[in-house]
């Protein structure tokens, strides 16, 4: 029985999707004005694992993750680079997809782009105005937060205590400081025509509209980074309640930050490490292993020592699996049985709010056991668990030359011709087969 921590209730709950054996999941994706940093990659990896494990449990999963390709940051960056917003957004969208594939996280079924849903956003905003949940001003359209009785339910705040967030504009013509923008009238950058003025949609409206357009109603899981809980996700809930009289999602899942030297990593602060740069130095599987060795809700303090630790751990896994794969080929072992006790442990850990650190410890134990005494069930179990975690060690193909080198090596050893034996042994060592 899968149990997950629901940020909406602040407690562990049994996972019961709205429709039996079918899961709809939406995760907030990047604003494509720059390459993602190593902290941005954490939700990409985690929710990929969520989808993989749900599929392992025989759920059908539809997974959407958006691309925010209209935003003030995109406009500012494009102007500085003297290119169009579309050119900038296209470049960094392609870069994001490329790095997501490299870290094994390109497991999306739908990747909606905000610019493809502008008409739907304008219609949505117009209906909120008609229903009294939004109002027009000279600067744009704003949402009346006071109209939502349980506003603050996700972030555990009361309206009277609200502080405006980073992405809430402090416009002087708002009714209340904490009202948030649905539409921003502007003369600068890319803009669209709407009945209340030319401009562009607010960030919070983009996601709620795309979620509704793709799934047509309440979804099972809405996810993202912990820093999106407020104001972004709170404001998505408010709009959904106003328009549809129900919450946007049944379960909300938030991933902890990855910080650099105890400081929040941020592109705007200029203290970020680009993920594309990290995986040029370290194996993408080592990055993934590092993330999964920490519980998804816990913060991670990144350092060179930390990633190097998991590079070594991954190298050990890869070497062990290659060595025993070669052994299986040599001895014509092709059984596909699993160690059922270990698989029960695996499922128990994953069912406990995706306790991946305990799964990584289980893998470490199985690797140690395998190196003590070969059991094909242990080998197959490690492969199965790693696959479900999206970690794919580079298992090398065993060629006829490799088998011949092994046989020649053994023969030379029998003949006590150690110089000749070393010649045949070296290519096997280079491949990690012995």
Curated annotation (Swiss-Prot):
Source organism per UniProt: Acholeplasma laidlawii (strain PG-8A)
Reaction equation(s) it catalyzes: tRNA(Cys) + L-cysteine + ATP = L-cysteinyl-tRNA(Cys) + AMP + diphosphate
Keyword NADP on entry: no
Listed Pfam families: tRNA-synt_1e
EC number: 6.1.1.16
Residue numbers binding ATP: 267
CDD domains: CysRS_core
EC class (word): ligase
Subcellular location: Cytoplasm
Protein family according to the UniProt entry: Belongs to the class-I aminoacyl-tRNA synthetase family.
Assembly and oligomerization: Monomer.
Name recorded for this polypeptide: Cysteine--tRNA ligase
Motif ('KMSKS' region): 264-268
């Amino acid at each position: 029985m899968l149990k997950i921590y629901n940020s909406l209730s602040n407690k562990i709950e049994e996972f019961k999707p709205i429709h039996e054996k079918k899961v709809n999941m939406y995760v907030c994706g990047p604003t494509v004005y720059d390459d993602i940093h190593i902290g941005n990659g954490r939700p990409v990896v985690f929710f990929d694992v969520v989808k993989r494990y749900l599929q392992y449990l025989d759920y059908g999963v539809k997974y959407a993750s958006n691309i925010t390709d209209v935003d003030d940051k995109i406009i500012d960056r494009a102007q500085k680079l003297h290119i169009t917003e579309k050119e900038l957004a296209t470049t960094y969208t392609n870069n994001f997809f490329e790095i997501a594939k490299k870290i094994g996280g390109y497991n999306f079924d739908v990747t909606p782009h905000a610019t493809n849903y502008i008409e739907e956003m304008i219609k949505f905003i117009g209906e909120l105005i008609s229903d009294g949940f939004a109002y027009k001003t000279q600067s744009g359209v704003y949402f009346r937060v006071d109209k939502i009785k349980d506003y603050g339910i996700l972030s555990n705040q009361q309206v009277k205590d609200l502080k405006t967030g980073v992405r809430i504009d402090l416009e002087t013509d708002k009714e209340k400081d904490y009202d948030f923008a649905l539409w921003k009238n502007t003369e600068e950058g890319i803009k669209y025509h709407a009945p209340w003025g030319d401009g562009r949609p607010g960030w919070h409206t983009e996601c709620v509209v795309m979620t509704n357009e793709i799934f047509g109603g309440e979804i099972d899981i809405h996810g993202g980074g912990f820093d999106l809980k407020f104001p972004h996700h709170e404001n998505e809930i408010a709009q959904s309640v106003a328009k549809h009289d129900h919450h946007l999602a049944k379960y909300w899942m938030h991933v902890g930050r990855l910080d650099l030297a105890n400081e929040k990593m941020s592109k705007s602060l200029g203290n970020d490490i680009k993920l594309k740069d990290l995986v040029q130095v370290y194996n993408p599987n080592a990055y993934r292993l590092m993330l999964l060795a920490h519980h998804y809700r816990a913060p991670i303090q990144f350092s060179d020592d930390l990633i190097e630790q998991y590079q070594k751990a991954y190298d050990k896994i890869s070497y062990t699996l290659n060595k025993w794969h070669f052994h299986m080929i040599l001895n014509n072992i092709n059984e596909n049985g699993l160690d059922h006790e270990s698989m029960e442990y695996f499922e128990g850990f994953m069912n406990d709010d995706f306790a991946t650190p305990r799964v990584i410890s289980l893998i470490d134990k199985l690797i140690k056991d395998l190196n003590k005494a070969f059991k094909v069930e242990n080998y197959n179990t490690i492969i199965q668990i790693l696959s479900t975690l999206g970690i794919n060690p580079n298992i090398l193909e065993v060629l006829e030359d490799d088998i011949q080198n092994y046989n020649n090596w053994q023969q030379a050893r029998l003949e006590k011709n150690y110089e000749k034996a070393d010649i045949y042994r070296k290519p096997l060592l280079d491949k990690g087969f012995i």
